[in-house]
């Protein structure tokens, strides 16, 4: 078991990549604190965690709320004694160019994606410094590297996450804290399906996205979770400041 006895916090654990990662981490021996604003989704994830013979806790709230982040980390450490892994998987997208995106939507995308990475890292790092080790895994996107159409807020936010990941890796490497980003391709999750549904005719958009990958298919959340497990575990003990593309060859094609 690659995470036996470890304590992990995963934001965005109510669905998609966050859920798949929580279940895999639990199956590999970690206790997983689940964070999401969707209580029903979290309950389903916790049931899946327990079905995998693991255990976890539920924490309902807004990942862009710094007080919530601080309280959740403090509660987890108080009950479990340490914090080994933080994975910031919560994400949000609104679509639109810089001209058509509403300012409120832009702020919401940055609050969830960038704020949800910064605030949870800010809460977790002091505990990891006290321990002398820890792994932080952030969620970027292949679009932050390649660019993309009609998704300016999301792409800009994911680019900020890559820069934040690198600077945290430099700032805290000497403390034994590793910080890495995963840049997924188009992964078959509820958020991806919602993004297609915004179009008047979703099917051509869906097919174009699928075919953009060298592998000519969408990724599965479980495939991204395997990459996250690698970054969480000692198998990546000399890996920090990297952006790991799990993109079916999107960037190469």
Regions found by a protein language model. Name each.
Residues 7, 14-16:
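Conserved glycine-rich cofactor-binding loop
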Residues 97-98, 102-110, 209:
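Substrate-binding pocket helix/loop in short-chain dehydrogenase/reductase
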Residues 141:
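Residue(s) in the substrate-gating loop at a strand-loop-helix junction
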């Amino acid at each position: 078991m690659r995470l036996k006895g470890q304590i992990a916090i995963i934001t965005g654990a109510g669905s998609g990549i966050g859920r798949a990662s929580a279940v895999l981490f639990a199956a590999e021996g970690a206790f997983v604190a689940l964070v999401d604003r969707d209580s029903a989704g979290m309950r389903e994830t916790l049931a899946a965690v327990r079905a995998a013979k693991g255990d976890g806790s539920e924490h309902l709230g807004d990942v862009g709320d710094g007080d919530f982040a601080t309280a959740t980390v403090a509660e987890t450490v108080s009950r479990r004694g340490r914090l080994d892994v933080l994975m910031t998987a919560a994400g949000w997208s609104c679509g639109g160019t810089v001209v058509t995106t509403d300012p409120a939507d832009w702020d919401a995308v940055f609050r969830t994606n960038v704020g949800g990475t910064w605030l949870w890292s800010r809460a977790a790092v002091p505990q990891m410094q006290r321990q002398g080790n820890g792994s932080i895994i952030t969620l970027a996107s292949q679009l932050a590297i390649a660019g993309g159409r009609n998704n300016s807020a999301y792409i800009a936010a994911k680019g900020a996450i890559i820069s934040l990941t690198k600077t945290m890796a430099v700032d805290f490497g000497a403390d034994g804290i590793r910080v890495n980003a995963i840049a997924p391709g188009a992964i078959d999750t509820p958020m991806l399906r919602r993004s297609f549904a915004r179009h008047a005719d979703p099917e051509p958009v869906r097919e174009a996205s699928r075919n953009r990958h060298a592998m000519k298919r969408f990724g599965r959340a479980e495939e991204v979770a395997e990459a996250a497990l690698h970054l969480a575990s000692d198998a990546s003990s000399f890996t920090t400041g990297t952006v790991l593309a799990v993109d079916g060859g999107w960037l190469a094609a």
